[in-house]
From Swiss-Prot:
SUPFAM superfamilies for the chain: Nqo5-like
Chief localization: plastid
UniProt key word Transferase: no
Domain of life: Eukaryota
The protein's assembly and partners: NDH is composed of at least 16 different subunits, 5 of which are encoded in the nucleus.
Record keywords, A-Z: Chloroplast, Membrane, NAD, NADP, Plastid, Plastoquinone, Quinone, Thylakoid, Translocase, Transport
Protein name: NAD(P)H-quinone oxidoreductase subunit J, chloroplastic
Species lineage: Eukaryota, Viridiplantae, Streptophyta, Embryophyta, Tracheophyta
Enzyme class: translocase
Matches recorded under PROSITE patterns: COMPLEX1_30K
PANTHER family the record matches: NADH DEHYDROGENASE [UBIQUINONE] IRON-SULFUR PROTEIN 3, MITOCHONDRIAL, NADH DEHYDROGENASE UBIQUINONE IRON-SULFUR PROTEIN 3
A UniProt-annotated Pfam family: Complex1_30kDa
Organism, as annotated: Aethionema grandiflorum (Persian stone-cress)
Function: NDH shuttles electrons from NAD(P)H:plastoquinone, via FMN and iron-sulfur (Fe-S) centers, to quinones in the photosynthetic chain and possibly in a chloroplast respiratory chain. The immediate electron acceptor for the enzyme in this species is believed to be plastoquinone. Couples the redox reaction to proton translocation, and thus conserves the redox energy in a proton gradient.
Gene Ontology terms describing biological process: photosynthesis, light reaction
Amino acid sequence: MQGTLSVWLAKRGLVHRSLGFDYQGIETLQIKPEDWHSIAVILYVYGYNYLRSQCAYDVAPGGLLASVYHLTRIEYGVNQAEEVCIKVFTHRSNSRIPSVFWVWKSTDFQERESYDMLGITYDSHPRLKRILMPESWIGWPLRKDYIAPNFYEIQDAY
């Protein structure tokens, strides 16, 4: 089932994939990394002027990484704002996604955190560097295949 934004994008020949609706009824779309920046600009011009949040997650060990954007379309005189969730998947071996910092400035720290924790490189981000972990840290702590250095599991402590 396609939502209103998916239909609108399809009429304009913009490549995407509808992932349905989440439990709150928010439309979820998948965008390819190479199409993400241009579609982000189009969505901003269309009225999605507020980036509510950006996060990332590891889909499966050895699998894809996902960058998730929650956008809101705020208009004067409208009681219920439109919301959409955009998912951009990338391979962990070459995890590069275009940054949307120049579209929504509020994604600055959020893309940096996704880089720091999962190693997703956001192309054209002006300050893409670690934000939570020290610069000397090796690896990406939130990847499912990450092995913590000097971690020892204590089985039977008593």
